[in-house]
Amino acid sequence: MIKKYLFPAAGYGTRFLPATKAMPKEMLPVVNKPLIQYGVEEALDAGLNEISIVTGRGKRALEDHFDISYELENQIKGTDKEKYLVGIRKLLDECSFSYTRQTQMKGLGHAILTGRPLIGDEPFAVVLADDLCVNLEGDGVLTQMVKLYQKYRCTIVAVMEVNPTETNKYGVIAGDDIGDGLIRVRDMVEKPAPEDAPSNLAIIGRYILTPDIFKLIEETEPGKGGEIQITDALLKQAKDGCVIAYKFKGQRFDCGGAEGYIEATNFCYEHFYKTGKAY
């Protein structure tokens, strides 16, 4: 049973400057909730309640958000504004939160390796804040992936088809279709040029990883810019037939850029906030 979830959140958020100069990008509001809260709620819905967050300099707001604010709660006690804290209170009651700091920005693989002391020798999920995923017609994306892990007991990565001209923005996979939206991965390339891409199936920010990934990351040589990419370690797993890509059900918004962030905000406003539905 997977219970642990790792949230790499040490990045600078340069695509949202100047807003992120003094505020973590993970705290950017989508309607009235910060981006990171959507990911934590998705994890809890999937049964993952041990939340580990890899932070960096200037990210104290993340820890403050997932904590009790006694002064604020006393101020709004007995008013209709209490309803706005119901969601975060649920997370505080049902989840445990732990933190570690990534002192150097050396890629996603390095960020995941930094979280190793918090995870231990267990399978775990990874969610990237930039990707907000929703499914209006069934289980959330992480719930779908947890169910697949329970069946296959191997690394699961969420993928989606992208415009072939945009493969240079993603890790891209190729493999053998085994039905039901599943691909047994045999090749994986980090941000290939369109003419070099093995397919147009791109990995998004949802992973379930087996604990051997840590050793594989340690053995990975830094690439461009001194960064250690998770794609390289995943490819080593894939060569042993231990990685399945999943074409998830639902929608994904790239909140790392202005266009996707605005689309996500409009979507959540129309489908959740405006209608009064929980989300």
From Swiss-Prot:
Record bears the keyword Transmembrane: no
The EC number(s) this enzyme carries: 2.7.7.9
InterPro entries to which the protein is assigned, alphabetical: GalU_uridylyltTrfase_bac/arc, NTP_transferase_dom, Nucleotide-diphossugar_trans
GO molecular function: UTP:glucose-1-phosphate uridylyltransferase activity
Catalytic activity field: alpha-D-glucose 1-phosphate + UTP + H(+) = UDP-alpha-D-glucose + diphosphate
Keywords, comma-separated and alphabetical: Nucleotidyltransferase, Transferase
Function as written in the Swiss-Prot or TrEMBL entry: May play a role in stationary phase survival.
GO biological process, one term: UDP-alpha-D-glucose metabolic process
Record-given protein name: UTP--glucose-1-phosphate uridylyltransferase
Phylogenetic lineage: Bacteria, Pseudomonadati, Pseudomonadota, Gammaproteobacteria, Pseudomonadales
Family: Belongs to the UDPGP type 2 family.
Annotated source species: Pseudomonas aeruginosa
Keyword Secreted attached: no
